[in-house]
Regions:
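Short tryptophan-centered beta-strand motifs in secreted/extracellular beta-sheet-rich domains
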Residues: 110-112
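Non-catalytic, conserved peripheral segments adjacent to functional cores
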Residues: 1-106
Length: 112
């Protein structure tokens, strides 16, 4: 697993090891011990999945304390250009954004 820090604190791009063969592939997308060692909170309590048709634009998501939650975003079919905007007042990167291509092909995940 490779973890790349972005210019926005708390946002990482994760590339898991993917083992491909004639049958398909296998990838470990989450391992609490490995995530914790990489500085990623390892106490996920909810797992969601959504399907977006081609051309769909999903809006910005934001949670205020005490309802904040981390997100681990991955794509299982197709691709998305995942954009994260820092709207945290007082953050040194307030107003800046970072983006990553997440796809079934590259198997990258975004931890927000």
């Amino acid at each position: 697993m490779e973890v790349v820090e972005t210019e926005i604190a708390g946002v990482k791009v994760i590339t898991p090891r993917v083992f491909r063969d004639a049958r398909g592939y296998f990838a470990e997308t989450y391992n609490a011990a490995r995530y914790k060692a990489a500085g990623i909170p390892a106490d996920f309590v909810q797992d969601n999945e959504s399907l977006s048709q081609k051309g769909v634009l999903r809006g910005l998501h934001w949670q205020a304390a005490p309802h904040t939650q981390a997100k681990l975003v991955r794509v299982v079919r197709g691709a998305v250009w995942d954009v994260v905007v820092d709207i945290r007042a007082g953050s040194p990167t307030f107003g800046k954004f970072t983006a990553a291509m997440l796809s079934a092909e590259n198997a990258n995940l975004a931890e927000i």
